[in-house]
């Protein structure tokens, strides 16, 4: 059985070796429920990634949180790192996966 890889444990050079650019990459943003979370995620993503994005939203069972998944075509590792940082700055966001 293959061993699971935790991306946090890998240095950036290793992460670059795992990904071949350009590649499809999905971000999942989890935040406190608010109506404009999807619009904020799309706006930030479009600043840093070209092409269409098709956000998918899911609300938690108690309605407290929303998760927004969004796909991009990543051109390089710096783009991925920048998006992680920028998406985490959105009001109410608790984590970016």
UniProtKB/Swiss-Prot annotation:
One of its GO terms (cellular component) is cytosol. It comes from the Bacteria. SUPFAM superfamilies: YbeD/HP0495-like. Pfam families: DUF493. Belongs to the UPF0250 family. NCBIfam families: PRK04998.1. This is UPF0250 protein HD_2015. It comes from Haemophilus ducreyi (strain 35000HP / ATCC 700724).
């Amino acid at each position: 059985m293959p061993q699971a890889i935790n991306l946090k444990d890998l240095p950036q050079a290793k992460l670059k070796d795992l990904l071949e650019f350009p590649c499809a990459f999905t971000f999942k943003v989890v935040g406190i429920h608010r109506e404009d979370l999807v619009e904020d995620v799309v706006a930030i993503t479009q600043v840093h990634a070209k092409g269409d994005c098709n956000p998918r939203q899911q609300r938690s069972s108690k309605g407290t949180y929303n998760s927004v998944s969004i796909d991009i075509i990543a051109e390089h590792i710096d783009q991925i790192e920048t998006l992680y940082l920028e998406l985490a700055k959105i009001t109410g966001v608790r984590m970016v996966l």
